[in-house]
From Swiss-Prot:
The keyword Transferase applies. The gene is fmt. This is Methionyl-tRNA formyltransferase. It catalyses: L-methionyl-tRNA(fMet) + (6R)-10-formyltetrahydrofolate = N-formyl-L-methionyl-tRNA(fMet) + (6S)-5,6,7,8-tetrahydrofolate + H(+). It comes from Pseudomonas putida (strain GB-1). (6S)-5,6,7,8-tetrahydrofolate binds at residues 109-112. HAMAP family: Formyl_trans. It comes from the Bacteria. Belongs to the Fmt family.
Length: 310
């Protein structure tokens, strides 16, 4: 079977690795154009491109797949199937119709819940009990196609966006390989999604990461976990930015953002409802530290009565 793979970030690269170890032929890889990254803003290839180059697989990086030339280039590859994972470009119907068996997608949620760009973080933020990967046939709509296969994992009370991402990146690739086998032998039939159950996972926005201490503590605790390792929740103290990487639910009352107490166990801050104990912070110019380490060296900065977010 001739497969064209389309994907961009590390999550997608894990799927490409599994396909490279499978009996299927990867005839080409599509990925986003190289982007500036790092302090020097040097053009860097995507994780998928780097892997493809290392395996001498032809790489295509069109700005769009909506024009006839790009579509003809894809058709010339004569793909039996296109596997799409976090590619970042919309595929028009003309592209979906090119492969003999169509296009399939590995999506990091239990569809139809959390269609869209940030399903992993939105599941943690919402307090969902479980997440997973759905392999589906692609349609022109956003994550709307018939579902071929699902794998499920519980979301634990200490899962972050990062830990859930890594777990799903391990679960998704074998599911895709299994789905391809089912398509090849005709044993796998798609299940139509119930649009009434659909929710949308909006793209992450850095502005969302600014902590609004008037919100309930339970919501903020989930947000802090969801946005770790990116974009990372933050607030201000004494005019300086403070990144908050971990927190636990606590008790106490005060003005939103008010420091209620500080100890080696954590920095207790009042929220709109109850309080949070901040257990891992990062100050400007420093690395992320447990609050017990910060408390030993910067105790005066975290005096009770000070207010975060002002």
């Amino acid at each position: 079977m001739r497969i064209v793979f389309a994907g961009t970030p590390e999550f997608a690269a894990e799927h490409l690795k599994a396909l490279l170890d499978s009996p299927y032929e990867i005839v080409a890889v599509y990925t986003q154009p190289d982007r500036p990254a790092g302090r020097g803003q040097k053009l860097m290839p995507s994780a998928v491109k780097a892997l493809a180059v290392a395996h001498d697989i032809p790489v295509f990086q069109p700005q769009t797949l909506r024009n006839a030339d790009a579509q003809a280039e894809l058709a010339a590859l004569k793909p039996d199937l296109m596997v799409v994972v976090a590619y970042g470009l919309i595929l028009p119907q003309a592209v979906l119709d090119i492969p003999r068996l169509g296009c399939i997608n590995s999506h990091a949620s239990l569809l139809p819940r959390w269609r869209g760009a940030a399903p992993i973080q939105r599941a943690v933020e919402a307090g969902d009990a479980e997440s997973g990967v759905t392999v589906m046939r692609m349609e022109a709509g956003l994550d709307t196609g018939p579902m071929l296969l699902k794998v499920v994992t519980p979301i634990s009370a200490d899962d972050t966006g990062g830990t859930l991402h890594d777990r799903l990146a391990e679960m998704g690739p074998p599911a895709v390989v299994q789905a391809i086998a089912g398509l090849a032998d005709g044993s796998l039939q798609g299940e139509v999604q119930d649009d009434a159950l659909a929710t949308y996972a909006h793209k992450l926005n850095k502005d969302e990461a600014r902590i609004d201490w008037s919100r309930p503590a339970v919501e903020l605790e989930r947000l802090i976990r969801a946005f770790n390792p990116w974009p990372v929740c933050h607030s201000t103290l004494d005019g300086e930015s403070v990144k908050v990487l971990a927190a636990n639910l606590s008790t106490g009352k005060g003005a939103p953002g008010e420091i209620l107490s500080a100890s080696k166990d954590g920095l207790v801050v009042a929220c709109g409802d109850q309080a949070l104990s901040l257990t891992r912070l990062q100050l400007p110019g420093g690395k992320a530290l447990s609050f017990s380490d910060l408390f030993n060296s910067r105790r005066e900065k975290f005096a009770a009565g000070k207010v975060l977010g002002q």
